[in-house]
């Protein structure tokens, strides 16, 4: 039913095991394969969302199935954040847990099938999704340090049910799956049966259409990569790891190509905004030269500074803590929420500390005398959002050096700053 050869060299195979029909069939197929072939260790993960009382009994059911299949089970309890979409919040919590489990190269198998593919296309059409939303669920994609794989996409729900019955498998029927207040359940229970009665191949054709849309998206992604190769040039060397694009290169593109390039770039960093919220790009792009526009997105924000747009997320969304003593400057100093610093060069006196700008700082620059730090940062074209978190090296009240700016140093040393992680939390 499925081909597992591409993933035989993975360190570990995991199965997202809800206990329902799809994941039970998937776990059985993998367990049977592992019993008869050399393969990576197989483990199951059950996510307990705590959203309904019936779910409290599901871990025990899953444990019994796993014991029967001789598969190790890990049960993870998650907190689902309240919001407009309970379905989306539960999905976010679930995939965040999966990302935490997966190590480098690990594979997470999930049980989505052809009917899921069709329902997803119809659901997103009704929401007015663009090509990226309408394209087929990929058979494989990155997830955390590993990959998510959907080996059942060519199988129908009926095919899985027939297999389960033939193998004598038992599974959980989630009562929430028949609650038609949820959009996906309404499509599955009320809409798709009528469509299939009139067009028996509806699910298969929807899934095929999603594959065609995926091919078209692939071509647009190739175009985006070409455009981003140009827009990515010229990033300041002083700020490694901080993602940015050249605004002029984007402005040279048509509006449609701008949006296509940004969709591709942002899709690797955040959940994409809906059509209505794309007005934020125009506001950011067209703001006055002296403005400091911000486009807030689901998992971070875009800001504009010195002719570039910059992606900020994770620690970059919070201001770092205040002054921090550096008792051992021979080793690196970790800065809470702001990466770490180290000294390179001649020996420096004891009693050092790292602090951040308060305003009015002066630095003795060799050959130039005392200079106002604000003016020096302007000369160096330091982005405005960096200035409040730029590590400053002090000896007592004397400013000795500014991180990552070799010209701004009083002592015979350099202060190297490893920037904080620009965290990405995509599912």
From Swiss-Prot:
Keywords: ATP-binding, Cytoplasm, Ligase, Nucleotide-binding, tRNA processing. The keyword Nuclease does not apply. Its EC number is 6.3.4.19. Its main location: cytoplasm. One of its GO terms (cellular component) is cytoplasm. ATP binds at residues 18-23. One of its GO terms (molecular function) is tRNA(Ile)-lysidine synthase activity. The N-terminal region contains the highly conserved SGGXDS motif, predicted to be a P-loop motif involved in ATP binding. Ligates lysine onto the cytidine present at position 34 of the AUA codon-specific tRNA(Ile) that contains the anticodon CAU, in an ATP-dependent manner. Cytidine is converted to lysidine, thus changing the amino acid specificity of the tRNA from methionine to isoleucine. Belongs to the tRNA(Ile)-lysidine synthase family. This is tRNA(Ile)-lysidine synthase.
